[in-house]
Amino acid sequence: MYTNEEIKSQVIEAVKKVKSSNPMAGSITNSVTINFVANAQLAVGGSAAMVYLPDEGEFLANAGGATYINVGTLMPIYEETLPRTAKALHEAGKPWVLDPVAIGIGDLRTSLLKQFKEYKPTIIRGNA
Protein backbone atom coordinates (compact mmCIF):
# COMPACT_ATOMS: atom_id res chain seq x y z
CA MET A 1 0.00 0.00 0.00
CA TYR A 2 1.23 3.48 -0.85
CA THR A 3 1.41 6.40 1.53
CA ASN A 4 -0.33 9.67 0.70
CA GLU A 5 3.05 11.24 -0.06
CA GLU A 6 3.98 8.42 -2.44
CA ILE A 7 0.66 8.75 -4.26
CA LYS A 8 1.04 12.52 -4.47
CA SER A 9 4.56 12.13 -5.86
CA GLN A 10 3.41 9.60 -8.48
CA VAL A 11 0.54 11.85 -9.59
CA ILE A 12 2.85 14.85 -9.92
CA GLU A 13 5.32 12.79 -11.95
CA ALA A 14 2.54 11.47 -14.22
CA VAL A 15 1.24 15.00 -14.88
CA LYS A 16 4.77 16.17 -15.72
CA LYS A 17 5.15 13.33 -18.23
CA VAL A 18 1.81 14.16 -19.85
CA LYS A 19 2.65 17.85 -20.10
CA SER A 20 6.00 17.11 -21.72
CA SER A 21 4.61 14.66 -24.30
CA ASN A 22 1.17 16.26 -24.99
CA PRO A 23 -0.47 12.94 -25.97
CA MET A 24 -3.67 12.81 -27.99
CA ALA A 25 -6.39 11.58 -25.65
CA GLY A 26 -9.44 10.42 -27.55
CA SER A 27 -12.89 10.41 -26.02
CA ILE A 28 -16.27 9.12 -26.96
CA THR A 29 -18.36 10.57 -24.20
CA ASN A 30 -21.83 11.86 -23.54
CA SER A 31 -23.23 15.30 -24.20
CA VAL A 32 -23.53 15.98 -20.47
CA THR A 33 -19.80 15.65 -19.72
CA ILE A 34 -18.07 16.38 -23.03
CA ASN A 35 -16.80 19.85 -22.08
CA PHE A 36 -15.68 18.73 -18.63
CA VAL A 37 -13.79 15.74 -20.04
CA ALA A 38 -12.08 17.81 -22.76
CA ASN A 39 -11.09 20.53 -20.30
CA ALA A 40 -9.74 18.00 -17.79
CA GLN A 41 -7.58 16.42 -20.50
CA LEU A 42 -6.31 19.82 -21.61
CA ALA A 43 -5.64 20.92 -18.01
CA VAL A 44 -3.11 18.15 -17.45
CA GLY A 45 -1.41 18.68 -20.81
CA GLY A 46 -3.19 16.25 -23.07
CA SER A 47 -4.54 17.02 -26.51
CA ALA A 48 -8.27 16.28 -26.35
CA ALA A 49 -10.13 14.79 -29.32
CA MET A 50 -13.85 14.22 -28.93
CA VAL A 51 -15.45 12.01 -31.59
CA TYR A 52 -18.77 10.38 -32.46
CA LEU A 53 -18.31 8.63 -35.81
CA PRO A 54 -17.03 5.05 -36.27
CA ASP A 55 -14.13 5.93 -38.58
CA GLU A 56 -13.02 8.70 -36.23
CA GLY A 57 -13.01 6.28 -33.30
CA GLU A 58 -10.90 3.81 -35.25
CA PHE A 59 -8.50 6.58 -36.29
CA LEU A 60 -8.07 7.70 -32.68
CA ALA A 61 -7.47 4.13 -31.58
CA ASN A 62 -4.53 3.92 -33.93
CA ALA A 63 -3.18 7.48 -33.79
CA GLY A 64 -3.77 8.50 -30.21
CA GLY A 65 -2.64 7.46 -26.79
CA ALA A 66 -5.33 6.33 -24.38
CA THR A 67 -9.06 6.62 -25.09
CA TYR A 68 -12.01 7.25 -22.77
CA ILE A 69 -15.40 5.71 -23.59
CA ASN A 70 -18.47 6.80 -21.62
CA VAL A 71 -21.88 5.26 -22.31
CA GLY A 72 -23.89 7.73 -20.23
CA THR A 73 -26.01 9.32 -22.96
CA LEU A 74 -26.09 6.99 -25.94
CA MET A 75 -26.71 8.17 -29.48
CA PRO A 76 -27.81 5.80 -32.26
CA ILE A 77 -24.44 6.15 -34.05
CA TYR A 78 -22.73 4.70 -30.97
CA GLU A 79 -24.17 1.28 -31.82
CA GLU A 80 -21.52 1.18 -34.56
CA THR A 81 -18.89 3.58 -33.19
CA LEU A 82 -18.28 2.02 -29.78
CA PRO A 83 -17.67 -1.62 -30.78
CA ARG A 84 -15.49 -0.61 -33.74
CA THR A 85 -13.43 1.71 -31.56
CA ALA A 86 -13.07 -0.83 -28.74
CA LYS A 87 -11.99 -3.48 -31.23
CA ALA A 88 -9.43 -1.13 -32.82
CA LEU A 89 -8.06 -0.21 -29.38
CA HIS A 90 -7.77 -3.87 -28.45
CA GLU A 91 -6.04 -4.77 -31.72
CA ALA A 92 -3.64 -1.82 -31.41
CA GLY A 93 -2.84 -2.69 -27.78
CA LYS A 94 -3.84 0.81 -26.67
CA PRO A 95 -5.07 1.54 -23.15
CA TRP A 96 -8.66 2.62 -22.73
CA VAL A 97 -11.05 3.52 -19.96
CA LEU A 98 -14.66 2.35 -19.97
CA ASP A 99 -17.21 4.30 -17.96
CA PRO A 100 -20.21 1.91 -18.01
CA VAL A 101 -22.86 4.37 -16.87
CA ALA A 102 -26.32 2.95 -16.12
CA ILE A 103 -25.52 -0.73 -16.58
CA GLY A 104 -28.65 -2.72 -17.35
CA ILE A 105 -30.77 0.19 -18.61
CA GLY A 106 -31.96 -0.49 -22.14
CA ASP A 107 -31.15 -3.12 -24.72
CA LEU A 108 -28.58 -1.06 -26.66
CA ARG A 109 -26.54 -0.19 -23.57
CA THR A 110 -26.62 -3.78 -22.33
CA SER A 111 -25.61 -5.13 -25.74
CA LEU A 112 -22.71 -2.67 -26.04
CA LEU A 113 -21.41 -3.39 -22.55
CA LYS A 114 -21.50 -7.14 -23.22
CA GLN A 115 -19.46 -6.60 -26.41
CA PHE A 116 -16.79 -4.69 -24.48
CA LYS A 117 -15.91 -7.80 -22.47
CA GLU A 118 -14.23 -9.19 -25.58
CA TYR A 119 -12.02 -6.11 -25.94
CA LYS A 120 -10.89 -5.92 -22.31
CA PRO A 121 -10.85 -2.28 -21.16
CA THR A 122 -7.68 -1.29 -19.31
CA ILE A 123 -9.66 0.51 -16.62
CA ILE A 124 -13.34 0.34 -15.76
CA ARG A 125 -14.42 3.54 -14.08
CA GLY A 126 -17.26 3.33 -11.61
CA ASN A 127 -19.06 5.52 -9.15
CA ALA A 128 -19.04 4.29 -5.59
Model-derived segments and spans:
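Glycine-rich phosphate/adenosyl-contacting loop at the front of the ribokinase-like
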Residues: M1-M50
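Glycine-rich phosphate/dinucleotide-binding loop and adjoining beta-alpha-beta core of small-molecule
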Residues: G57-A128
